[in-house]
C-alpha cells in the first residue's frame, strides 16, 4: 500500500528524506573481509551510525543479533535507512556510555526518527544515559526498547530504559499474538505492546553457525527480537505520514513523532487487545495498512473510501480526539483543492 506513493513526485509537500531508524546492537555483518555478507546487509540503506570504539567495528558482528535486528527492520519497513551503532562485542555487559553516545549522535548528527534498543539493565543510575533519552524525546525522536534483557527481572518489573516514560516498551508474542511467557510482569501505568518475538527469522552472519537451512538466516527469540519489529512498524507510520494525503499537514507527522502520539496510534490503529483484561496490545500493521481486490495498491490519496484515504482519516480522527479538533483541517483544504481540479469526489464511491 505504501509503495504507490513512496517515490511521490509531489515535491512541494512530501518530505524528501527517508525514515531513519538507528539500531543499537552488536553491529552488522557487512564487511566482506570478515566473511560472506548476507545479501540484505549489502544494501546501501544499511549505514554507519558512529564508530564508538576502534575495537567495535560497526560493519562486523560476532554475535549475530545486530545483523538479525537490522534485517528485521528492513523487512518490516523497506523504505527506511538503518543507521548502525555497535555498542557491544558479544554477550558481555554493555557499557552505558556507548549507548548514551550512540543516542546523542543519532539524535544530533544523523537526525534519525526512531531508535531501536534491544538492550536493558536492572537500574537507571547512569545520568548520561538518562540525559540522552530525555534529549531524544525533546527532539521528537521515538525510542523503542526491549522490556527484558537476558532474563533480567527487576523490582520494577521491567528493564531500563524500556520502563522510562520517554520510551515505548516492547514485549514478545508468538505467531498467534499470544504474549510470551518470558515477558516481565506488568508495570503500573505503562503501555504494553507485543510484537512477534518467537521464531523470528531474519538475516544472520554467514560465518556464524545457524540451524536455518538457508545460509544467512536464523530464527531467534526474545523481546530483543520483537523490538526492531515494533520500530519498523513505527517507521511505516512515519513513511505514511510523509505521503499524500497526510503530508499536506506537517503537524500530523509532528504529533506522530511524539511518544504520546505514536503510542496512541499504535494502540488505536495498529494493534488489538490480546484479551479484555490483558495489559498487552499486539501490534499488527495490516490492521491499518491493507489493500482490497479493487484497490490492490491501496487506491489514490483523494479517492473516497479507498484503503489509503481510510487509513489516513483513521489516524487523523484518533489524533483529533486526543489532541485538537483542528487536526486534519489543513489536509481537508488541500483535498478540496484536489477535488476541484478534477480529482475523486469527496462523496463519490470508488
What are the functions of these language-model segments?
Residues 68, 88-164, 214-228:
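Substrate-binding/access-modulating region of protease and related hydrolase catalytic domains
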Residues 83, 142-144, 168-169:
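Structural detector of well-ordered beta-strand residues that form the stable sheet scaffold
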Residues 107, 113-116, 239-350:
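C-terminal subdomain of the subtilisin-like protease fold in secreted/lumenal serine endopeptidases
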Amino acid at each position: 500500500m505504501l509503495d504507490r506513493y513512496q517515490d511521490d513526485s509531489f515535491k512541494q509537500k512530501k518530505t524528501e528524506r527517508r525514515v531513519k531508524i538507528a539500531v543499537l546492537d552488536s553491529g552488522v555483518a557487512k564487511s566482506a573481509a570478515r566473511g560472506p555478507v548476507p545479501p540484505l546487509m549489502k544494501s546501501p540503506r544499511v549505514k554507519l551510525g558512529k564508530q564508538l570504539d576502534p575495537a567495535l567495528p560497526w560493519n562486523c558482528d560476532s554475535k549475530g543479533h545486530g545483523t538479525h535486528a537490522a534485517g528485521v527492520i528492513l523487512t518490516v519497513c523497506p523504505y527506511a535507512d538503518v543507521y548502525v551503532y555497535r555498542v557491544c562485542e558479544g554477550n558481555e555487559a554493555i557499557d552505558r556510555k556507548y549507548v548514551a553516545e550512540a543516542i546523542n549522535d543519532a539524535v544530533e548528527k544523523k537526525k534519525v526518527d526512531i531508535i531501536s534498543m534491544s538492550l536493558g539493565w536492572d537500574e537507571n543510575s547512569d545520568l548520561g544515559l538518562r540525559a540522552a533519552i530525555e534529549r531524544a524525546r525533546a527532539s521528537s525522536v521515538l525510542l523503542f526498547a526491549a522490556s527484558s534483557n537476558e532474563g533480567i527481572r527487576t523490582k520494577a518489573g521491567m528493564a531500563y530504559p524500556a520502563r522510562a516514560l520517554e520510551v515505548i516498551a516492547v514485549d514478545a508474542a508468538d505467531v498467534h499474538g499470544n504474549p510470551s511467557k518470558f515477558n516481565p510482569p506488568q508495570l503500573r501505568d505503562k503501555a504494553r505492546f507485543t510484537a512477534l518475538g518467537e521464531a523470528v527469522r531474519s538475516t544472520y552472519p554467514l560465518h556464524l553457525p545457524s540451524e536455518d537451512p538457508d545460509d544467512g538466516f536464523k530464527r531467534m527469540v526474545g523481546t530483543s527480537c520483537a523490538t526492531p519489529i515494533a520500530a519498523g512498524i513505527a517507521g511505516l507510520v512515519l513513511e505514511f505520514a510523509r505521503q499524500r494525503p497526510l503530508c499536506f499537514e506537517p503537524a500530523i507527522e509532528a504529533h506522530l513523532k511524539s511518544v504520546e502520539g505514536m503510542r496512541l496510534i499504535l494502540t488505536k490503529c495498529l494493534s488489538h487487545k490480546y484479551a479484555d483484561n490483558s495489559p498487552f496490545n499486539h501490534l499488527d500493521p495490516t490492521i491499518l495498512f491493507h489493500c482490497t481486490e479493487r484497490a490492490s495498491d491501496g487506491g489514490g490519496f483523494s479517492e473516497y473510501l479507498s484503503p489509503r484515504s481510510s487509513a489516513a482519516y483513521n489516524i487523523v480522527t484518533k489524533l483529533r480526539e486526543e489532541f485538537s479538533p483542528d487536526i486534519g483541517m489543513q489536509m481537508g483544504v488541500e483535498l478540496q483543492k484536489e477535488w476541484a481540479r478534477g480529482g475523486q469526489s469527496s462523496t463519490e464511491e470508488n
